[in-house]
């Protein structure tokens, strides 16, 4: 039994003791129905990528501001001195939602970590959807989100305070696909929430970009409404519902399978606790 499987079993037991505090990521209005699409734009043009960064949500911990935690758009950020890690967080299909901001605040207040979440929905006419839609549309979205991540990593080079050797790439749901596909050099670790790293209705194929020994933390509900075997949209795929298969043999990987049915889980106490242990181990000065 590999290390990843041992950790998975231990963390599953932990997850079963906690209460369910999260809700489904994408809120569907009464007028929406499966397959609905609004907007058309998914092109990763320079202007579109700039818009995602311009409206990004940046959160700086008090330790970097010498005052108190700061939150806002990058252009309004206060001066920061010294060097510090940075978490680049890709939101899900509902945008920079309250759950995303809450997670960033937790990173700042509890972990002392700065984070930035580019806003994909800042793109004018950006296509949004109610699953399921065609895999071609999903793949265009994943291409855009990966371009947003690459742009964010490049744009963050303007911040002299970022320790480029301690950049964490994170994503939740839709954003986790791009977070897992990034194959560039700037990744000290990954946080993959609510995505299973495997072939299913949401992708043509996983196209994973992390290395065989790169630190990766994956957390997902056992009965996730989108990516678990219980979703009928996955009936043509041999899904397990988590990233354990993709991470098997990786000595620096942790997979937390939560005993729950909800999709958005990054703010659950058990998930936060496991995330804290993981980040503390990989971001040692």
Task: Mark where each language-model region is.
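An N-terminal hydrophobic leader/cap segment in hydrolases
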Residues: 2, 20, 24-76
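Bacterial N-terminal signal peptides that target proteins for export
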Residues: 2-16
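Serine-hydrolase catalytic machinery in alpha/beta-hydrolase-like enzymes
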Residues: 51-162
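Loop/turn elements at helix/coil->beta-strand transitions in domains of secreted/extracellular proteins
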Residues: 83-86, 111-114, 164-166, 186-190, ...
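Alpha/beta-hydrolase active-site loop signature
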Residues: 94, 121-124, 197, 224, ...
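Primarily recognizes the serine-hydrolase "nucleophile elbow" in alpha/beta-hydrolase
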Residues: 154-210
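The feature captures the conserved acid-bearing segment of alpha/beta-hydrolase catalytic domains
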Residues: 189-257
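C-terminal catalytic histidine-bearing segment of alpha/beta-hydrolase fold enzymes
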Residues: 248-285
């Amino acid at each position: 039994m590999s290390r990843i499987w041992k950790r998975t079993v231990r963390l599953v037991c932990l997850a079963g003791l906690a209460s369910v505090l999260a809700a489904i990521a994408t809120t569907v209005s009464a007028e929406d129905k499966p397959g609905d699409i609004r907007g058309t734009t998914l092109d990763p043009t320079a202007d579109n990528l700039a818009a995602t960064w311009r409206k990004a949500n940046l959160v700086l911990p008090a330790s970097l501001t010498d005052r108190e935690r700061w939150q806002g758009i990058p252009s309004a950020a206060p001066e920061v001195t010294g060097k510090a890690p940075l978490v680049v967080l890709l939101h899900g299909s509902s945008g920079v939602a309250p759950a995303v901001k809450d997670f960033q605040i937790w990173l700042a207040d509890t972990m002392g970590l700065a984070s930035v979440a580019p806003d994909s929905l800042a793109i004018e006419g950006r296509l949004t959807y109610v699953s399921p839609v065609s895999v071609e549309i999903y793949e265009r979205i994943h291409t855009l989100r990966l371009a947003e991540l690459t742009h964010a990593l490049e744009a963050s080079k303007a911040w002299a305070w970022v320790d480029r050797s301690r950049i964490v790439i994170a994503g939740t749901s839709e954003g986790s696909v791009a977070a897992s596909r990034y194959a560039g050099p700037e990744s000290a670790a990954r946080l993959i929430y609510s995505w299973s790293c495997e072939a299913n209705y949401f992708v043509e194929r996983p196209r994973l970009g992390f290395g065989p020994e790169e630190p990766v933390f994956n957390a997902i509900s056992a009965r996730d409404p989108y990516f678990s075997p219980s979703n009928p949209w996955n009936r043509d795929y041999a899904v397990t519902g988590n990233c354990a298969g993709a991470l098997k043999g990786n000595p620096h990987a942790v997979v937390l399978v939560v005993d729950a049915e909800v999709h958005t889980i990054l703010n659950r106490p058990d998930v936060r606790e496991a995330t804290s242990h993981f980040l503390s181990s990989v971001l040692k000065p």
